[in-house]
Amino acid sequence: MVRKSPGSGKEEDFTFISPVVKYLLIFFNMLFWVISMVMVGIGVYARLLKHAEAAMACLAVDPALLLIGVGILMFLITFCGCIGSLRENICLLQTFSICLTLVFLLQLAVGIVGFIFSDKARGKVSEIISNAIEHYRDDLDLQNLIDFGQKEFSCCGGISYKDWSQNMYFNCSSENRSQERCSVPYSCCLHDEGEAVINTLCGQGMQELDYLEAGEFIHTNGCIDRLVNWIHSNLFLLGGVALGLAIPQVTKHLRAKLIYTWRIGIQV
């Protein structure tokens, strides 16, 4: 769209930005802004409910910290986008655009690195799972997450059900006086579909059995192999989800760029 500045004979080129673009950007940023505050609130609430010693012992595998971290990052980015587009502030719009670009490139880089260095990625996943097993009883959120994963993937432990010996309560050593000695969590057990009441002691003493004997009562395969197989069989689905996450980022980036370019044009 061509406009003429009053009192000057020069023509200046401005790109017309529809109010729809502006208010769509504001709407989506406000939506994710609210979501980010909810995530931070849930994460902080979950952290406050935990005992101080237990909370400090398993910081690396605490789902609450992940919620808080992602929530704060999302809050800051959407704050720049929302206020920047509402006030048409060039600095905030540029910051928002750069942040979205960095997040998108980071997601892309993680996917590529994970694919190229799959062995190292597998080792890192194994390390995270081992750490989670070690702190299974220290954090209720982590415990629920592990139980959910083992039930969903029909697995037990990282590499095998024997990995549960890494936990001080399930350890098979003679020094361990726990009632759960040499056992596995109930989420490892084979359950009948029509079973009304779940026996939480079904994993008692399972680590003392060999694979064939234990296989009659619990899942003996590790969760790492199950997870890798699930990823391989759902590559197209995961690709679609990744694309679905990328499209809003790209469109918001483009809208921010349009408004930013428009504002620069007006100030020329």
Curated annotation (Swiss-Prot):
Source taxon at top rank: Eukaryota
Keywords, alphabetical: Cell junction, Cell membrane, Cytoplasm, Disulfide bond, Glycoprotein, Membrane, Transmembrane, Transmembrane helix
Annotated SUPFAM superfamilies: Tetraspanin
Any one of the GO CC terms: plasma membrane
InterPro entries xrefs: Tetraspanin/Peripherin, Tetraspanin_animals, Tetraspanin_EC2_sf
Residues exposed to the Extracellular side: 45-63, 117-226
Pfam families assigned: Tetraspanin (PF00335)
Keyword Nucleotidyltransferase attributed: no
Membrane topology term: Multi-pass membrane protein
Disulfide bonds: 155-223, 156-188, 172-182, 189-202
Ranges of the Cytoplasmic topological domain: 1-23, 85-95, 248-268
Subunit: Homodimer; disulfide-linked.
Entry protein name: Tetraspanin-33
Organism, as annotated: Xenopus laevis
Lineage, opening ranks: Eukaryota, Metazoa, Chordata, Craniata, Vertebrata
